[in-house]
């Protein structure tokens, strides 16, 4: 009895047919390419993968992946992802969020997802600003940042996601940067291999 062997998927096989609509030069492009390469090298089946996002520039992500996807409401991606994983334990569940979406209105959902430690891959894009709504300060904006909502400068100190994640009991916490493609891929591989909630902060530029 012969068994057919499926060809290994390439990074481009994880790209959907949708036009990528981020601003030219945005670091989100590099993160998208790195995750597509990661899934290819890990030989993750597309039909077993789902990307779940909230609202913001990073939250366009599910549209650009040739996998299952769910574009939810502001800040609720970790809650939807938790339900998805509990109902479908065999699914490879990824959460895509940003510093505004995940640390402001969605901060409570993120905290409890990290605390529960079920098998989720959480990626937080940190560009230190609300990019989609044209540059208001976010929870990670540096003190003194000038913006439409802080014309005299932000008075708050930036929130450290890594410190917060460790403080609520996260077991896998990492950080990478959009300009180091090899490191992006390696960090994603390691976090994917962790059998619990992994949290990776992706520092990326905003144009």
Regions of interest found by a model, annotated:
Residues 1-10:
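Short, charged low-complexity linear segments at domain edges
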Residues 10, 90, 138-193:
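Conserved thiamine diphosphate
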Residues 12-73:
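Active-site diphosphate/adenylate-binding microenvironment
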Residues 22-24, 95-97, 172-177, 199:
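Short catalytic-loop micro-motif centered on adjacent basic/acidic residues
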Residues 27-34, 46, 75, 79, ...:
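Conserved active-site and cofactor/substrate-binding residues in soluble primary-metabolism enzymes
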Residues 48-54, 95-98, 124, 176, ...:
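Beta-strand segments within the central parallel beta-sheet cores of soluble alpha/beta enzyme folds
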Residues 57-131, 183:
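Thiamine diphosphate
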Residues 196-207:
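Internal helical hairpin/lid segments
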């Amino acid at each position: 009895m012969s068994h057919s062997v499926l060809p290994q998927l390439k990074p481009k096989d994880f790209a959907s047919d949708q036009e990528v609509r981020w601003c030219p030069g945005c670091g989100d492009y590099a993160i998208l390419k790195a995750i597509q390469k990661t899934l290819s090298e890990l030989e993750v089946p597309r039909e077993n993968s789902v990307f779940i996002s909230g609202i913001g520039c990073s939250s366009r992500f599910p549209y650009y992946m040739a996998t299952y996807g769910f574009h939810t409401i502001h800040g609720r991606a970790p809650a939807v992802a938790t339900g998805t994983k509990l109902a479908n334990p065999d699914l490879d569940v990824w959460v895509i969020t940003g510093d505004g979406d995940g640390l402001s209105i969605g901060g409570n959902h993120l905290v409890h997802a990290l605390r529960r430690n079920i098998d989720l891959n959480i990626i937080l894009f940190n560009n230190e600003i609300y990019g989609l709504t044209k540059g208001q300060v976010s929870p990670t904006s540096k003190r003194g940042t000038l913006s439409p909502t802080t014309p005299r400068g932000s008075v708050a100190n930036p929130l450290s996601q890594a410190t917060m994640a460790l403080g609520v009991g996260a077991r896998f916490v990492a950080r990478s940067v959009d300009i180091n493609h090899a490191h992006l891929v390696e960090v994603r591989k390691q976090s994917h291999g962790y059998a619990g909630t992994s949290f990776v902060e992706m520092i990326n530029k905003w144009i």
